[in-house]
Amino acid sequence: MFDVTLLILLGLAALGFISHNTTVAASILVLIIVRVTPLSTFFPWIEKQGLSIGIIILTIGVMAPIASGTLPPSTLIHSFLNWKSLVAIAVGVIVSWLGGRGVTLMGSQPQLVAGLLVGTVLGVALFRGVPVGPLIAAGLVSLIVGKQ
């Protein structure tokens, strides 16, 4: 029997490779492996916990320079004294807020996830964009379509 979902996943993985978005491509390939093996029984758990685990891993990556000492406390303190750093802090707050809205939107309207992913991959492939991820994109979408 023809598996349309598998074909879509393969197409998205190909777009990931074409656009040099290895994160998207690798993620989709992992999901393909899960789908075609007995690991598919874990999909309910992945769907329920995957986003939270991903955010935890992302937060670990962002906080690692502080924890390792690569980013010394003096640099953190000085970030409150420079106007460019204050702008960066404000933008960080706004982007985090958008990401939160994006998580809510993706949870309440999962049908938008494919569109966000395709849009991100096309932006990288066609406009030399950077794959900043679907959470911020979903947050921006939530400002347009509303958070439901």
Swiss-Prot record:
The gene is yeaL. It comes from the Bacteria. Belongs to the UPF0756 family. This is UPF0756 membrane protein YeaL. It is found in: Cell membrane. InterPro entries: UPF0756_TM. Keywords: Cell membrane, Membrane, Transmembrane, Transmembrane helix. The lineage of its organism: Bacteria, Pseudomonadati, Pseudomonadota, Gammaproteobacteria, Enterobacterales. The chain crosses the membrane at residues 14-34, 51-71, 86-106, 121-141. It is a multi-pass membrane protein.
